[in-house]
Amino acid sequence: MITRLIRQWDADIVIVNRPNDYHPDHRYTSILVQDSAYMVTVPFFCPDVPALKKNPVFLYASDRFKKPNPFQPDVAVSIDDVIEPTLDALLVMESQIQEGGANGYAGLFPEEPVGRQRRTEESRRSLARRYAGEATRYRDVLARFYGDERARNVHYAQAYELCEYGRQPSTDELKKLFPF
């Protein structure tokens, strides 16, 4: 199914978590997408949807896991201009971002409106700090694409690592795929 969807979308870029993510759903989805990274170009696999002539670029979203190997960014993108809509979109997913429930603790998301608003604001600040941390942590990668001066002024960023199974773009191609 994933192979079919990528073909139907005629994707240029596919972004997924790395296969050593903390969450089982993330790990297994990553493996399925990795498998599709090869299969999207194989004509006799899922013959009901035409195989892609050009393999998409498959990217891993950044994380802080160190084992079995740490995240190694190949591209970093400023999200300064879209940080607010990015946070708004993430906060809509209450069950994923705000409710908690991990490790058996279900008390993070209060039922009363004032408490819910407070939790939403805490989650917003936490997510913003994460993206600010990426801008700081991957400043050198930002500089490769934006130049030193512009990179110094980036407040929020997202970084990505190339998946070894998809197309391996050059720096010039990455600059075309991501408008710097």
What are these regions (language model features)?
Residues P43-P47, K54, F65-N69, V75-F180:
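C-terminal accessory domains and tails appended to enzymatic cores
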Residues M1-C46, L52-K54, Y60, F71:
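Active-site beta-strand->loop->alpha-helix modules in alpha/beta enzyme cores, enriched
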